[in-house]
Amino acid sequence: MRRLALEAGCAIMEIYNGPDFEVKTKSDSSPVTAADEAADTIISDGLHATFPDVTLITEEQADSHSLKSTEFFIVDPLDGTKEFVHRRGDFTINIAYVVNGIPIRGVVYAPAKHRLFYTDAQGQSLEETGPFDLEKIGTCQNISVAIPNPDGLRVVASKSHRDPTTDAYIAKYPVSDLKSAGSSLKFCLIATGEADLYPRAGRTMEWDTAAGHAVLNGAGGGVVRFDDLTPLTYGKPGYENPYFIAFAKGVSLQKP
């Protein structure tokens, strides 16, 4: 999974750093570029070749969205296409492995930010520092959530999808810092101790969250449903998520 994320990142950055690229619109009105498609081909081909018997769900292949399994890979080859299109850098490659509703392995790679996060075989999350080599793993550091300051939480929210419900929920907490970030980087900022709370009261799909969720789990954090604060699970109908809250353990979660 690490190697495929890096290979996909190389393909994405070649387009990102090149001349203007075409932006098409999918049936759900979301944007898609040649970078999404190139990364999807690299990751899909690699996973099918290595794990031919494991179901693969990927954002860019609509036919996969009706597949069902208790064990599957779920992929967003370019999470944060709007950030990519506007060359803001906050986009990621997300690859996760889900078993019985739980994302147990995940890779999140932000090629423009030179940040790479993933879980190891024991479930511990780490960040690898670049430069990144396809064959050789570089310097890695275990990551873990911070102990939140109850007098002022550090909150991270969507850069492209803010809404009144999210803002109202954030207002329930004492906040010392509020930052915006794109894509699944928000989960990783909590996982590294750079933020404490990420509420999302907007539409997301499982491929948007599974890899970041796995990384956050492996760093001691968690993700729950917004409505009843029960754990967010995967393999739901249509692979659609409810609203959710990602958090560092130690945050006293408020009900909406």
Give the residues covered by each predicted segment.
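N-terminal subdomain of lithium-sensitive/metallo-dependent phosphomonoesterases centered on the IMPase/IPPase/PAP
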Residues: 1-78, 99, 164-172, 228-230, ...
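Oxyanion/phosphate-interacting regions
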Residues: 1-3, 9, 167-172, 187-256
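Residue-level signal for inorganic ion chemistry
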Residues: 12, 36, 47, 81, ...
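Conserved beta-strand termini and adjacent loop/short-helix elements that scaffold enzyme active sites
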Residues: 26, 59, 158, 181, ...
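Short glycine/proline-enriched turns and hinge-like loops at secondary-structure junctions
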Residues: 67-69, 85-89, 119, 237
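Glycine-rich active-site/cofactor-binding loop and its immediate structural neighborhood
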Residues: 71-111
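Acidic beta-strand-loop-alpha-helix segment within the catalytic core
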Residues: 96-187, 232-256
